[in-house]
């Protein structure tokens, strides 16, 4: 199997001052192309360290994606490191220099002399175009390893990988068939509880069951070779059966996006009133393009479940909304949820059984509970659901 590695560069990445989203994206993207990463390394802006690791990985990896260090400043060292590792000099790529000058001219700017550095590549390098920025990429062969050098700006990096690097890999190597990866996301059951229920399932050869906990959800993944796809699809039915009503969506689209699509297809507008969640619901649904009619964040106040149910019913009527959803204030470890619909208003009062979680985590969990309440109503399910340390202590329905 082709041994593919990634090298992230930059002091800000090494020291945790920024999150390396490029590495996460590349690992996921390459995995679904049949090119799982076998190793990831991070090195700061130090020429000796960069040269050392390039020479080291050139003895082990077939392909190395180097990210970052192609800018115009003194701490951008990737091109010089590549040239030094190969024992050659840098040469000016005249065509890219002209392209950069055109790039700045079209934007009414004068190119700084420091940008000239971005057109200096190792003498043996293969030029790689960057259609969306000033940092071109390049490729060099060092010992057994084909190395691709890419810009750190995420939008530029992704375009280069998808449109320049992946086609080159397909030309030069015989790539394996992408693996099959089936995913679903659950809410309300713990990772250990799900694992205990699923451990008895017999997995086909080469197939693995994975769990990823990210408060407040658990993702289940069934991954295996394409040759086992039929057996995996059959097993997936058992996985969904065992997970039961804790399943909130399949795939990677996300619950807000699926709710948004369902609301649009059924021509339901939605109004929101949030206290404890502080606008988190509105943010998630608006980003997903949900048909939101009105949203408000109001100060927390102590109220009974009946009060929450009645005022969200009135709010739906006043706004002529298809649906209205409310999350009340948090008082004495209790919280109210209410959903006003054409079929009536459904309300739940829940109790937190622990105080060990932060405010942010509690808000995330409650936002997901509210979304799940909406999802369950849209799917003609009982709206009540619990989540480990959150217990439903009261429910009520107001008829139309």
From Swiss-Prot:
Transmembrane segments: none annotated. It comes from the Bacteria. Coiled coil: none annotated. HAMAP family: CinA_B. NCBIfam families: cinA_nterm, molyb_syn, PRK03673.1. Belongs to the CinA family. This is CinA-like protein. It comes from Escherichia coli (strain SMS-3-5 / SECEC). The lineage of its organism: Bacteria, Pseudomonadati, Pseudomonadota, Gammaproteobacteria, Enterobacterales.
């Amino acid at each position: 199997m082709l041994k593919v590695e990634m090298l992230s560069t930059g002091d800000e990445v090494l020291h945790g001052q920024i999150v390396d989203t490029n590495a996460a994206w590349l690992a996921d993207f390459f995995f679904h192309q049949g090119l799982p990463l076998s190793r990831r390394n991070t090195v700061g802006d130090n020429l000796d360290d960069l040269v050392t690791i390039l020479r080291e990985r050139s003895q082990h990896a077939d392909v190395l994606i180097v990210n970052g260090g192609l800018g115009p400043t003194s701490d951008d060292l990737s091109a010089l490191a590549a040239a030094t590792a190969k024992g050659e000099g840098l040469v000016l790529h005249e065509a890219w220099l002209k392209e950069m000058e055109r790039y700045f001219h079209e934007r009414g700017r004068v190119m700084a002399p420091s940008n000239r550095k971005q057109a200096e590549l190792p003498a043996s390098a293969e030029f790689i175009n960057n259609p969306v920025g000033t940092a071109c990429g390049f490729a060099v062969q060092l010992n057994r390893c084909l190395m691709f050098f890419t810009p750190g700006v995420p939008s530029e990096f992704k375009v280069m990988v998808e449109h320049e690097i992946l086609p080159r890999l397909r030309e030069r190597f015989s790539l394996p068939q992408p693996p099959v990866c089936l995913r679903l996301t659950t809410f309300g059951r713990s990772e250990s509880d799900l694992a205990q229920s699923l451990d008895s399932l017999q997995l086909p050869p080469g197939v693995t069951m994975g769990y990823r906990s990210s408060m407040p959800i658990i993702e289940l993944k069934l991954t295996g070779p394409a040759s086992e796809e039929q057996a995996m699809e059959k097993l997936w039915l058992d996985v969904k059966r065992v997970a039961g009503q804790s399943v909130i969506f399949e795939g990677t689209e996300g619950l807000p996006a699926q709710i948004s699509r369902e609301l649009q297809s059924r021509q339901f507008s939605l109004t929101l009133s949030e206290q404890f969640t502080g606008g988190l619901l509105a943010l998630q649904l608006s980003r997903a393009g949900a048909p939101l009619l009105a949203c408000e964040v109001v100060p927390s106040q102590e109220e009974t479940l009946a009060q929450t149910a009645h005022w969200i019913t009135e709010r739906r009527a006043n706004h002529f909304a298809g649906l209205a959803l409310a999350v009340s204030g948090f008082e004495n470890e209790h919280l109210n949820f209410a959903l006003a619909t054409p079929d009536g208003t459904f309300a739940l009062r829940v109790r937190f059984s622990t105080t060990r979680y932060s405010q942010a985590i509690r808000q995330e969990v409650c936002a997901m509970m509210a979304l799940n309440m909406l999802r369950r109503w849209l799917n003609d399910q009982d709206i009540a659901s619990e989540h480990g340390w959150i217990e439903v202590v009261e429910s009520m329905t107001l008829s139309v």
